[in-house]
């Protein structure tokens, strides 16, 4: 009976992580569709995909907890490092992108930071644990925005490519290729 329970649990682990992988692939596709066509409908589909993928990931929390009981100290540390990259909370929203009183804040608006995976990994927690640039909650902030009142979600228009500079940007000597697109 115990072996049957253990084997059943191992099967459940496989099932749960397969579900996470599947939901993440669907979410990645929705992100791609949104970036190709940044409209409200594609943004809503992407938001729905984030909710499904994140919920699926949260269902694996128990497996990570139990794995700590059987893994070496080194493997547990690796697991914590991965968890920090995947699902760290809380994050510092202004480190990632603009917030209400600081429209130009965040690494998204920092013209000295190249927005690619390598740079984002380097920026992740560089000065403080809350300065996350990776993971579900960073994506959540980028998708919904600050939205403190739960009624003013980030608009899809934030993701439309910039094709001309504002007068302030021109006065500051910026070039179009320096603007986040």
Q: What does each model-found stretch correspond to?
A:
Residues 1-181:
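Mature extracytoplasmic or organellar-lumen-exposed domains after removal of signal/transit peptides
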């Amino acid at each position: 009976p115990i072996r049957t329970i253990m084997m059943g649990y191992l099967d459940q682990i496989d099932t749960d992580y397969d579900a996470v992988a599947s939901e993440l692939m669907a979410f990645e596709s929705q992100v791609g569709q949104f970036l190709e066509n940044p409209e409200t409908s594609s943004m809503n589909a992407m938001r729905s995909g984030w909710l499904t993928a994140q919920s699926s990931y949260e269902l694996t929390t128990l497996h990570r907890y139990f794995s700590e009981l059987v893994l070496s100290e080194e493997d547990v540390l690796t697991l914590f490092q991965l968890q920090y990259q995947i699902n760290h909370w809380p994050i510092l929203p202004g480190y990632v992108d603009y917030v209400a009183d600081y429209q130009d804040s965040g690494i998204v608006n920092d013209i000295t930071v190249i927005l690619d995976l390598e740079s984002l990994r380097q920026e992740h927690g560089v000065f403080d644990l809350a300065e996350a640039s990776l993971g579900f909650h960073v994506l959540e902030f980028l998708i919904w925005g600050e939205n403190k009142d739960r009624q003013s979600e980030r608009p899809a228009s934030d993701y439309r490519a910039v094709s001309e500079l504002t007068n302030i940007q021109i006065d500051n000597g910026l070039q179009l290729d320096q603007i986040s697109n």
